[in-house]
Amino acid sequence: MKFYSNGKILITGEYFVLNGALSLAVPTVYGQYLEISDNDSNIINWTSYNKNKQIWFKCELDKDSLKVKYSSSKEVSEIIKELISFIREKESNFLKSNGSIINTELTFDKDWGLGSSSTLINNLSKFSGVNPYELNTKFFNGSGYDIACADSSSSLLYRLNDNKKEIKQINFNPSFRDKLHFIYLNKKQNSLDEIKSFREKINSKIGITEISDITKRIILCKDQLEFNSLIKEHENIVSKLTSKEKVKDKLFNDFDGEIKSLGAWGGDFILASALDKNPTDYFKSKGFNTVLNYNELALV
């Protein structure tokens, strides 16, 4: 059996989606495959491949006890053991055949922060029947927007309302999308650490109304100058409330247009809205060589 889940990009609502802000999320054209087959080895053979079809992780677990017989990474194998154990609490026969071969394959660079964990969780959920949001909450305590993107065929609005998930698929495909680019900052952020830090520092009610209002205005936006004004306003709010420096001020203060951080600030991808020419050469001159136009990354 083979399963696939989309990666994700959070356009608005980073951090504040955790506390109930209405947020705009976009599934990506990249994702992760999970293929499972049985054998007679009494072993769970797990192999993970990167986008170049090279092995980046491998382990062997006893199918019953989940004792690690071999692992190329103790940290990763412990996470996999915990995932399997938790799923077995809900579905006792999960991976209890005579043995299993499990292969995962990313179609994006695993350092890009597009959801290597959420796509894995969603794929395991499809196979096991266990609720993916329950798995996600147990292991990552995130908002769940990434799980919503995993099976979505379009952009979506996402909100947590009294811990209930409100998801609405929308068509976010702005007419000026040829002026929008995603740039990788050559650094992967630790989502778990960022979530923990935010929850400890920020009052649960602060910023929700303002961020939600910007999201509503962005999805209706027809004009690039208005869009730029809105993402600038979004950056100002997040910067003020989290005491984090805006990425444009820090790295790109001479950029002709506006820039918005996506997800945890300081790494992964940013969104650039260029007023004039294609900004690829500009970002490459600054040392950032991964520049994708909107349609190259967003599933539209």
What label would you give each PLM region?
Residues L106-K110:
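Acidic, glycine-rich active-site loops and adjacent beta-strand->loop/helix elements
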Residues F3-N6, L10, V17, A25-V26, ...:
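C-terminal nucleotide
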Residues D111-Y133:
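DPxDG-like acidic metal-binding loop motif
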